[in-house]
Amino acid sequence: MLLLVGLGNPGKQYEFTRHNVGFVVADTVARDFNFPEFSSKYDALVSVGNVGLHRAMIVKPATFMNRSGAAVLKAASMHKIPAEQITVFHDDADLQHGVVKVKQGGGNAGHNGLRSIDAAIGCQYWRVRLGVGRPDVGSLSGHVLSDFHDFDSVQQLAHKISANLTELLDGNVNGFISKIRCDHAQ
């Protein structure tokens, strides 16, 4: 089984914020692949289904971002899922809005959710970095906790990620990125 983790903060007040773009992708994948309703487990909202030929558990930690690692560790430990079979979808202020990059391992670039996951399971999991840009003025924390100006474009990108996710899960990272870029340009 694969673990697909969408990072975000719980609560309606954070629903449309940049920090919650991981939740948007997780919800979109669950809908697009007809996963059952999310249930509470492992300090998270969890749903298990299939993404193409891949059995997957989608996890949305029910803790705040800086404590996401606990939920990921519980789900991964319970199902004996190694870090290499975990993919985390998260916001990245170092990328322009709408840019998507994928990597395995590496540093957390100051992202508190990734820092928490690194401490819990190590850093060899896959990361799908979802660009939310940096503010021209003001604080970064204020920026990522503010709502998207164009939430429709975020939902469109989430659907493109979902539509091409099997490429990524099959190990074709370049094909996945190529299709996202091509689709996103349309």
UniProtKB/Swiss-Prot annotation:
What InterPro entries does UniProt report for this protein, alphabetically? Pept_tRNA_hydro, Pept_tRNA_hydro_CS, Pept_tRNA_hydro_sf
Q: What is its EC number?
A: 3.1.1.29
The residues that hold tRNA are: Y14, F64, N66, N112
> Which GO biological process annotations does it have?
protein quality control for misfolded or incompletely synthesized proteins; rescue of stalled ribosome
Q: Where in the cell is it found?
A: Cytoplasm
| PROSITE patterns documented for this protein | PEPT_TRNA_HYDROL_1 (PS01195), PEPT_TRNA_HYDROL_2 (PS01196)
Keywords from the named record: Cytoplasm, Hydrolase, RNA-binding, tRNA-binding
Single GO molecular function: peptidyl-tRNA hydrolase activity
Reactions performed catalytically? an N-acyl-L-alpha-aminoacyl-tRNA + H2O = an N-acyl-L-amino acid + a tRNA + H(+)
- What residues form the catalytic site here? H19 (proton acceptor)
| Highest taxon of the lineage | Bacteria
Q: Name one Pfam family in it.
A: Pept_tRNA_hydro
Where are the bilayer-spanning segments? none
Q: What does this protein do?
A: Hydrolyzes ribosome-free peptidyl-tRNAs (with 1 or more amino acids incorporated), which drop off the ribosome during protein synthesis, or as a result of ribosome stalling.
Q: Which family does it belong to?
A: Belongs to the PTH family.
Identification of the protein by name: Peptidyl-tRNA hydrolase
Q: Which organism is it from?
A: Anaplasma marginale (strain St. Maries)
Upper taxonomic lineage = Bacteria, Pseudomonadati, Pseudomonadota, Alphaproteobacteria, Rickettsiales
Q: Which gene encodes it?
A: pth
